Amino acid sequence: KKVSKYIGLNETVVAQQSLEIPYAYFWKELLRDQGKTIGRLDSRYIGIDRIDAGEKSDYNPELTSWEHSFTPAINMYLRDELGYKTDLNYFIFGPTYPWDNTNNKTGDNLRQAMMQNPYLNLLVQSGYYDGATNYFDAKYTMWQLDRSGHMKNRLSFKGYRSGHMMYLRYEDLKQSNQDLREFILSSLPNPEQAAKY
């Protein structure tokens, strides 16, 4: 009952999934009764599938919008402003998926770098409506970097009322830029300060 209440799916569906709701299924199921789906990278975008049944959405509605907005814009900028001419197609999302994450030790590598460099700070910025690199996973991952709490003054986390691309919402663009500026300024060591170790 609690899982159902927290995520917005009915209790029967949650029980049928044994409390483990696959992401793709969630995006399809949340608004299924309305015949709609939600976006993966930004759940504020709504899609309509060919049929309401199924385990996953037919497409990501946010990508349709973004590809029609950003691909022509970057192609025009490259061609007209920078004078770059090519027969190659520009892809917002290239044909590199699925990535091989077999030896992905990004978190461990970052933790090691932060332990070895006392001037290395981390700012994580996350959109509440991002289902790909979602807010709570990002926060959890950051917490795992410093279970002891020894580096907590070097870790910053900011959340925004947008999806994966926070800069698409003007208020978040302004705030995330300001947060980034403040982070950079606060991360700079005093020129007179000696090395810590």
Predicted regions and their residues:
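Short, well-ordered amphipathic alpha-helices
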Residues: 138-146
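Catalytic histidine-centered segment of alpha/beta-hydrolase-like enzymes
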Residues: 132, 161-172
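Catalytic histidine neighborhood in serine/cysteine hydrolases
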Residues: 147-165
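Post-His helix in hydrolase/transferase enzymes
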Residues: 137, 167-182
